[in-house]
């Protein structure tokens, strides 16, 4: 069985199509080719917000003004990967931001695979955006001890990966955490820390271990 990859990934977010509610002949887009790229160079884009935009009536047009599926436009212009973030419960509290939960990520993965695109899913371990300035612990876990939080990360990660498997749409890559240079799942997993980063390391290991338990073929 072909090895699948589990690692952190920087996607080259290349805008391949034109987004607008009305097509415009004046909205010219030019993307100059980059010479000497290796054949396995990933050309990807994060499209987590796409279902939300479509639900609000957004339409997408290719460079010739023809209305098309945005994923198809991207593929036509060289995109071969998409990234999908997963928030634990984006409908809780302030939430929103496209409600990019597990269910939407599964649906988008199926849609991408139908077009021959590969998929990376990105666990934020948050109900909202996780980045260097904020790594909010999901509300359901916010009163956890360190041991409880480690267990929650493991169990949640394993369940999501198994859900993708059962849906018949395993992602080609899985990213544990998002923009985690300052840690994740604050305050327990925040960096730098007084414990020598042990709590952060335990949380990371829990996520990685869960993926490999659910899918031993990942490296």
Positions of predicted regions on the chain:
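Bacterial N-terminal signal peptides
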Residues: 9-20
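N-terminal carbohydrate-binding accessory modules
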Residues: 27-79
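Bacterial N-terminal signal peptides that target proteins for export
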Residues: 1-10
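Substrate-binding cleft and catalytic face of glycoside hydrolase catalytic domains
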Residues: 73-196, 203-218
């Amino acid at each position: 069985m072909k090895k699948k990859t589990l690692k952190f990934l920087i996607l080259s977010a290349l805008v391949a199509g034109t987004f607008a509610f009305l097509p415009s002949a004046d909205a010219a887009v030019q993307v100059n080719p980059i010479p000497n790229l290796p054949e396995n160079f990933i050309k990807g884009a994060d499209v987590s917000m796409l279902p939300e935009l479509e639900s609000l009536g957004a339409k997408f047009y290719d460079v010739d003004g023809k209305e098309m599926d945005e994923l198809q436009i991207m593929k036509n212009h060289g995109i071969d990967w998409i990234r999908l973030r997963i928030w634990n419960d984006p409908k809780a509290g302030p939430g929103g931001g496209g409600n990019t939960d597990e269910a939407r990520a599964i649906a988008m993965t199926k849609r991408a695979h139908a077009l021959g695109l590969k998929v990376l899913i990105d666990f934020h371990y948050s109900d909202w955006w996780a980045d260097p300035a904020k790594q909010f612990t999901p509300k359901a876990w916010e009163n956890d001890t360190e041991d409880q939080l480690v267990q929650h990360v493991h169990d949640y990660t394993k369940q999501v990966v198994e859900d993708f498997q059962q849906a018949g749409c395993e992602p080609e890559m899985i990213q544990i955490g998002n923009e985690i240079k300052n840690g994740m799942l604050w305050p327990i997993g925040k960096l730098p820390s007084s414990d020598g980063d042990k709590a952060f390391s335990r949380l990371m290991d829990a996520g990685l271990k869960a993926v490999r338990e659910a899918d031993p073929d990942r490296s």
